[in-house]
Amino acid sequence: MRQNFKFKIMFDGTRYFGWEHQPNTDLTIQGKIETVLQRMVSSEKVPEVIGCGRTDAGVHAKAMIANAFLDTDMSTDAIRDYMNRYLPDDICILEVKEAAERFHSRYKAVGKTYCYTCYTGPLKPVFVRKYVYYIEETPDIVKMEEAAKLLMGVHDYASFCSNPKMKKSTVREVDSIQITKKGQYIRFTYHGTGFLQHMVRILTGTLLEVGFGKRDVSSIPELFEAKDRSLAGFTAPASGLCMMQVDYN
């Protein structure tokens, strides 16, 4: 019986070219999952796995949500176990649930949480280097928090989007940016209705520039008015970014 299934997925994105299919490579999260599902249902047609977003190359996820229509009588636990048996060790299916016919992991999402992690100190973090952005000096947390308040709200985030050909609206709502420091780790946690291409990484780069005194807090409002990518901060490396949670009604 054809049924819509919802998947919660955890993955280490280090060796992948992002979530979405890419030409000339099979190293995408979507591709690996679809290959296993095709084998599971013994179908000539590859089942389409719809992700809640398009994570970039090198970005990680603790709870990516996806859905797919499958013609199978297997239980949700059996599907999960089968997938985990044949998926690479850097991709894990945490949960499989039956979903409503109209459920769409991307269009039904109402919020997302991302965490960006920096590691500070004089010595390189050899064993966690794939999951952090290493910076030797510690930025000014107080100044970054001041800037973060100005970056929150409903704004046109065109200056924080790396896609200059974006045709759809670049207005988004970011309702929370939390910056925490614990030991040598600095974490930027973002929650919003949705994020543009590279938006979280550009927001992080902008905040770090404030923290290092390369940008004034007072300059933040001008970035929304300018709608010019070249005026915002640098794009922080993909390694530090992780999708933490996706919200649905």
Task: Outline where the language-model segments fall.
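Structured-RNA-binding interfaces characteristic of tRNA pseudouridine synthases
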Residues: 1-249
